[in-house]
Amino acid sequence: MDLADYRALSFDCYGTLIDWEAGIAAVLGPWAREVGLDLDDERLLAAYADGEAAVERDRPTAPYPEVLAVAFRRAGEGLGRTVDDAWAGRLGASVPDWPAFPDSADALASLATHYRLLIVSNVHRAGFAASNRRLGARFAAVITAEDVRAYKPAGDHFRALLRTLDDLGIARGELLHVAQSLFHDHVPARKAGLRSVWINRRHDRPGWGATPAPSEPVGYDLEFPSLAAFAAAADAAFAAR
C-alpha cells in the first residue's frame, strides 16, 4: 500500500486528534473522589464508554453536550453513585478544555502538504470549532453529528463523507479514513467501502478506554502508534516518488 497514491484523508477528531480520554477523566476523577469511589481513570473510562455509546444510539439528534451529561449520569448509576446536575453540566461543557495530543498539530500541518484534510466527528459544530483552535488546521470539510443528526458508528457520517468527496472531485479510492476507534470509525468506514488507517493511541495500554470494544468484525489497512508516525510514513512515501 503506497500512501502517495491517495489525495485526501478524513479524520475522526476525539480520540485521534484530541485526547478526549484525558478530558473526560479530568471531570470523572474529581467527581469519583467527591462521591467516595476509589477508582483509577481506566476504570472510570470503562464505566463511561458503554453509556455514551448507548446514549448516542438512543438519542441520535441530541447535542453532544447533552450526550456527555446523560452518559455521565448513566455511568454514575452503574457505579452506584449519583451524578448531580452540576457535575453532569461540567462534563457537558468540557469539550473546549480537552487537550490535543502533543503530535496532532504538527502532524496535521505535515499531512496537509500532501492531502486534502476532512473531519468526520461525533461532536457539535461549536465543540469542534473550539478544538480546532488547538489543532490549527484547515479542513476542506467538517462533518459533525450536528450536521448529520446521528452519531457514529451509524453510517450517516460516512454517507455524508461520500457526498462531500463527490463535491470535491475526489474518488472514494483516493481517500483514507484515519481514526483511533475501531468501534466508532473502522467498522462503519469498511462498510462504506473506505480504506482506513488505525492510529492506535492506546498501543501501550490494555483495554479500550472510553471506547467500547468493536461488536462486529473490523478491518483496517495500516496501523501506527501515533499520528506523528503516520505523518512520517506519508512524508517518506511522497519523497520516494
Please report, for each region that a protein language model flagged, where it lies by residue:
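Asp-based, Mg2+/Mn2+-dependent phosphohydrolase catalytic module
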Residues: 1-6, 105, 109, 116-241
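N-terminal helical cap/lid subdomain that shapes the substrate entry/recognition surface
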Residues: 2-102, 113
